[in-house]
């Protein structure tokens, strides 16, 4: 298998509004990110994925783009972006830009022209119909919005301020590739591609994802932009299977480096239900089956996967499947060890490395997220209780991931000097923050630091086979095996003691959140025990 730099990379995702505020306006910005590069270098990560920093009215926090080649005022300007690229490069950190080309903002020059001049070339950059069909928006309600100016409906799978682009138009596609090359010429390390599986949609046939021309478009994009460069490209593909992922990420196909698959994330809510109908407990046996499928069916050389628990759209993994009480640190380390020792490129979401948790939202006024607010409005109209809605939002709402990064125990967790931050700071910041994590050699941070270092240096993490072991329900154990060596990873995903008997003779500990001896002596795993050993 041909090796690429991203096989041994760990990527750190930054949500710019919430990372670090340099100018005291309560909103994170590019200068703030640059000021924290030394911290990220200490963690050891290879690249930063920046959620969108482009010019935007911020209807969906930057995923509604008005100008792809300008920076939103709240984040700074292009000089700040260039400075971030230069300073990151000095520290051997690549910058991965968020590519949002399923839709634009309705304030993008293309859409303004399309709306005002139905005869313009830009009109066909978007999808217009005389009558709507039954397609619905991800953010609730119809996916069609009537435009009084031109007397037609336009398609928006997200908010009505995010009109979908018409990828069947070759001029539109070329404009996208030109924009991508603008960023490639600036020296970025790649693209994370937002809902890329939607660009092949055929609305008249009710096809929203995985349309018949999807892979043709991605191949064309590859040839016209990043394919000539050694860049990381990762597609957000909610419906991907291992078979579909081979199509995207087999190097012979010349499409993408890897995808984000979300099958394990689906366990957060009840089967075939909206995300708001969340599961109160993790089904560990289902999690084992899903990871086993992805680790064994996406074979080495046939494609590549990403490994993640958190991102800007998901609840904090500790609040979902870990322990936010007495075992917070131990469960955070256990979840990290379990994930990072599989095959794939790991992604760390800001604050994950210090064990940040969900926010205790009490009222709708504390929220910012359009998805949560739209859901609450719709659910209230249908007679749901506010108490129940707030419980759901506290558990799975997107703002949980977006509260400000917790740097220290000072005002606003050291994120901002402002009297009001754009989202409230989690009240637990005095206990959970970077400063206290760095001061404690046993903190979650140093487990992540070690996992990042292992990924860079240990070839077996890329090459080794994966074998799931038969264990009790709450124990997740697997072996990574090459022709020369084998590594055993064992994690107790519960706060109860679990049986685990294995011949550990002459095993050498690689990383752990516990001691090996009690496990070998008693055949028992204590709450949230996690260990990786090299078998002799």
Region annotations inferred by a language model:
Residues 56-57, 103-105, 198-203, 240-245, ...:
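Flexible loop/turn segments at secondary-structure boundaries
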Residues 497-515:
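Beta-strand-rich binding/interaction modules
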Residues 5, 225, 232, 239, ...:
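Loop/helix patches that line or flank the sugar-binding groove of alpha-linked glycan CAZymes
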Residues 202-203, 304-325:
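Active-site clefts of carbohydrate-active enzymes
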Residues 2-177, 181, 185, 196-251, ...:
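Acidic/aromatic-lined carbohydrate-recognition and catalytic surfaces
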Residues 183-193, 305:
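Active-site regions of oxyanion-processing enzymes, predominantly non-cytosolic
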Residues 520-536:
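C-terminal beta-strand-rich structural cap/linker in extracellular carbohydrate-active enzymes
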